[in-house]
Amino acid sequence: MEYFDMRKMSVNLWRNAAGETREICTFPPAKRDFYWRASITSIAANGEFSLFPGMERIVTLLEGGEMFLESADRFNHTLKPLQPFAFAADQVVKAKLTAGQMSMDFNIMTRLDVCKAKVRIAERTFTTFGSRGGVVFVINGAWQLGDKLLTTDQGACWFDGRHTLRLLQPQGKLLFSEINWLAGHSPDQVQ
């Protein structure tokens, strides 16, 4: 289990100066050719998403104005707060900020031939489904994960097992993504 606080994470500025990325985790760790990766991005200007052949991307707007996503002949979609949207990361997707407002997004990418991610929003205590990896990010409230207290802009990632996240207040929201491995694949096979 690895814990993080978004306010203390390293920030990587984009080459085109249109945004920045805070990488949460990758699997396998510290590998350029990852099977899955979670990050938080801030987008300050209209532009195109980076291409990642063979990957699926799920984007969830955390804060800021809505964002219009367009992929020629494939889709037009308005990204609304806390509504995950998945698309192939090997297609050109243009992002247009509405009302010029900067957005902050949670991104998870998975290699299509190896694993699949599912992103959800939780508002009550729950136990993960025994996936082989995942990420949680606290939107608001106080949550207990094992012996660790997580509050707004904090989270954790793991590479194995079931975990219970207990909401400690009457209200709270938590984004979580679980990674499930396709038949014939397992994190145990990765060196």
From Swiss-Prot:
Q: Gene3D superfamilies from the xrefs?
A: Jelly Rolls (2.60.120.10)
Q: Which family would the database say this protein is a member of?
A: Belongs to the Ves family.
**Protein's organism:** Escherichia coli (strain SMS-3-5 / SECEC)
- According to the lineage, what is the superkingdom? Bacteria
Report the InterPro entries cross-referenced here. Answer: RmlC-like_jellyroll (IPR014710), RmlC_Cupin_sf (IPR011051), Uncharacterised_HutD/Ves (IPR010282), Uncharacterised_Ves (IPR023482)
Which interval of the chain is the signal sequence? none
Q: What is this protein called?
A: Protein Ves
